[in-house]
Regions:
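Functional-site microenvironments in short loops/helix caps that host divalent-cation chemistry
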Residues: 55, 61, 66-70, 122-123, ...
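Extended beta-strand/loop cores of jelly-roll/beta-sandwich
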Residues: 2-6, 11, 20-162, 171, ...
């Protein structure tokens, strides 16, 4: 019989070469992984710049313009927070043509050694179809846009609420819906219920809240999915009375608040209006009713598109 001390020595003699081999394998594969990630980062960098739409600044009346536009000279909505109609003047800026997708955001999380988002069972169906807008909480949206700024050397950030509405209204015109013709036409420029199920068949038990991007025509400015396909976070804190005190020049919302504004909507005519305001907690924790366990801290239907806070057009 082999003494126990010799058995331990024999096992250790086998273990050391095996550990060395595993270490060498990992080391040899790491450069390939880094090279692959570097390629994805470079591709995203080029995409982020080429995706920009330059929006020339100007002056417009922000808010529910029904009293000066509708036949009855009445507001289009009963919402108090999108009133009063007030003048706003904006400097020029650029806005992303498309929303951030899960593929885009995966590059950000991988590059920063973070866990990928939306890996829960309820979220995964949206990942299984390419080019679907990512559901993000506000801190994630903000961090992603600022990271693009570090990546490109450009002042990327979230758009302000005023910038978003000005863009949705084709530089402040009296446009009701930010579609190709200013109309809400389900099946032609907005996804109808049956189309949503067809475009995202991985979602089995309910109508998808988002669908792949750029299925329908862009707005006259060249912006896709400003309504009818999820919402966009903006920079501003929310205040119901902000329009009463908003500065005219480049407003950025209240200094502080409890909820953040998001604009656009997935499938509703009224909330899809260019001037309709919505807000929610920046990082809402959604819990299981029975256990109280948090299963997500983001809404699948609120995402982001980034802006470049610069007065000149950017090119790749």
């Amino acid at each position: 019989m082999i003494p126990s001390s010799l058995r331990r020595l024999f096992c250790l003699s086998l273990l050391v070469p095996m550990q060395a081999l595993a270490g060498n394998t990992s080391a040899s594969s790491q450069p390939a992984l880094s090279q692959e990630l570097a390629g994805r980062i470079e591709t995203l960098k080029k995409k982020a710049i080429s995706d920009l739409v330059f929006v020339e600044g100007g002056r417009f009346q922000m808010g529910d313009f029904g009293p000066i536009h509708s036949e009855e000279k009445l507001p289009y909505t009963s919402q108090p927070e999108n009133k009063p109609l007030h003048w706003v003047e904006l400097d020029s800026f650029s806005l992303s043509r498309h929303k951030v997708t899960y593929e885009d955001f995966d590059v950000f999380t991988d590059a920063n050694n973070k866990l990928r988002i939306a890996m829960a069972p309820n979220d995964k169906p949206y990942r299984e179809v390419p080019n679907v807008p990512a559901g993000l909480n506000w801190p994630e949206a903000k961090a992603y846009c600022k990271w693009l700024g570090k990546l490109t050397g450009l002042p990327f950030d979230l758009p302000t609420e005023a910038q978003w509405e000005y863009s949705a209204r084709n530089r402040g015109q009296m446009v009701l819906w930010p579609t190709d013709n200013g109309m809400w036409e389900e099946g032609r420029n907005i996804a109808a219920y049956d189309q949503r199920k067809e475009l995202l068949p991985t979602v089995k038990f309910f109508s998808p809240v988002t669908v792949p991007l750029a299925i329908f025509p862009p707005s006259p400015l060249g912006l896709y999915d400003m309504t009818g396909n999820g919402s966009d976070w903006v920079e501003d804190w929310f205040s119901e009375k902000y329009y009463e005190v908003s500065p005219e020049k480049n407003p950025r919302g209240p200094v502080r608040g409890k909820t953040k504004v998001f604009r656009g909507v997935e499938s509703d005519r009224e909330t899809g209006l260019t001037f309709y305001r919505q807000h929610t907690e920046p990082q809402k924790k959604i819990r299981y009713r029975d256990s109280g366990e948090v299963f997500t801290d983001r809404w699948p239907n609120i995402g982001a598109r980034c802006a470049v806070q610069s007065g000149r057009a950017e090119s790749p």
